[in-house]
């Protein structure tokens, strides 16, 4: 059976991963400071970062249309779709609308839309898990069941260098934004099982916050034997150091690093790192 894995552009697959040939990326659109960025291979991350830093307003994002997803679903027997957390974006809803349209026109095609309940590194982890299962020749329903169980176990943690975009778009309370801005506090944050953002701790420096992140992972016995994905936003050296620190304290089977695309750049901003496992 032929298959493809359709992802939205917050799934930060590397160029080498895309060479597998089964991945199709459907881009979101970003608007900041009067400029529009399509989140595909043409996006210039530095231009986006500059626009965001110069703007008084939060960047806005637009999810793909149902038609964009529908176009991506064509041509195979089995379609697996991975989207941003439904709590963060309308991407999941649009992918579901496209699935219903596909069922009407091509009932013989299997389509499953997965709410990653995560973003960035978490979406990458889900997409790679689907690839592993589908390439092994498992039937569609088996791949779906295994992937749903995998999503239920995913943990996502992140530390941001700057909270400006969270402040601008209202995801931080005004008081919290003032305090963290004045003291330059670094928040150690995570995702809930439902895919919402929560605060896990704070530190005075990025190094301390990342240390808390590593300690949090090390204290979780469920991490052992898994694959960790680190997504970095314009900070490859920081990501490499984080990987080395994780390797010292944790027992992952593998740790991979991926660069942030446009949507992750909006969420994580310059210097942010996201870890999923």
Indicate where each model-derived feature is located.
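Generic beta-sheet signal
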Residues: 3, 79-81, 226-228
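N-terminal/domain-start segments enriched in small and hydrophobic, helix-friendly residues
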Residues: 10, 48-56, 63-69, 74-77, ...
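Active-site cofactor/cluster-binding pocket
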Residues: 64-104
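Mixed-charge interfacial surface used for oligomerization/domain docking
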Residues: 10-24, 28-29, 88-91, 95-100, ...
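A glycine-rich beta-strand to alpha-helix segment
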Residues: 83, 112-113
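Conserved phosphate-coordination/catalytic loops
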Residues: 60-67, 204-208
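N-terminal glycine-rich anion-binding loop in soluble enzyme alpha/beta folds
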Residues: 3-62
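Short beta-strand/turn micro-motifs composed of small residues
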Residues: 7, 83, 232
